[in-house]
Amino acid sequence: MKPLRVRAAVCVLALGLLTACGGSGQDVVDSSNVPRLRAHAADAVNGRPRTVLPQGPRSVFTTYRTTGDDGTKVLHTKWHGRASGYTGDVWAWVPPQYAQPQYARSGFPVLIALPGAWGYPANYWADAPFALEERLAEWSKQGKTLPFILVMPVLNPRKAYYDGSDIPGQPKMGSWLTKDVPDFVRANFRTYGSRDGWAYMGSSSGGFAALKAVLKEPQRFKAAIVNGPDTAPDSPLWKGHPAEELANDPRHLARQLVARGGPQVYLAFELGSKEDAVPDVKRFISGYTNGARGPIHSTLFEIPDGVHSGHTYIKRMADSLHWISEQMQGPVAAPSV
């Protein structure tokens, strides 16, 4: 799978401008066929979900870029992870609904968005060419997706591949992504206490990390959008550590989850039809997921003529976000007086 990562690295420039993969400026995305979300039956059964108010310490943010005309901004800060010991860059964006009075005491669902290639020193999902924040504001306003808090950390500590894992003798990037980054979110934003409010999205190497995070810790994370992923660990840093490598292999984790019978997780895969990864990812889906039956639920959005690029995946992002939104907890408005 390493050639996929190399190709992605060639395509991704410093700020996520994928000019080498074709196109400039914002991609044209048609979400007209994405329906509105259904009412969440779980809300009526379980009542008001438990909101977790910001725990602190609050981060000091700077504005990375302003998004659209709704007053929202992508913010940037650094966060020191207690679990990993790593200090890294994080970008964050809250949807317009977060500041609306009716949601002032409500939690919001969180989407941890991971880039492809090295995912260092930047995270391209924070940048204007993809306009993920502007699109999510539009889609959630239309009722097609939930209004997620977007959190966009660096994926790796340098220009090397750590497979989103705690590789012995290396920076603990698995702990960074699954413990420290959620701690950052809980320190600064209103969230939910249950896994119904937590999901990942990632592409290529970030897709591997997103897939693995949900399969490894399904009690904490419910869903992932997995774009053109690697489906097996392949960092050269695993050499000499076969047991730890196996413990971070999505195939092994999927088998374990199926054997346990749950908890149920939801994986939305995106693939460009021209990707080299198509056969491998389809084998993973057919071999380790059970479609609608679970405990590993899956769906696949295959993009005609699509290649291994964020410009491909953004085209079906509304569909993927809609699909996982149907399984997750949205904000709850205060009762009308």
Question: Which residues does each predicted region cover?
Answer:
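Non-catalytic cap/lid and distal C-terminal segments of serine-dependent acyl enzymes
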Residues: K2-V12, G16-V337
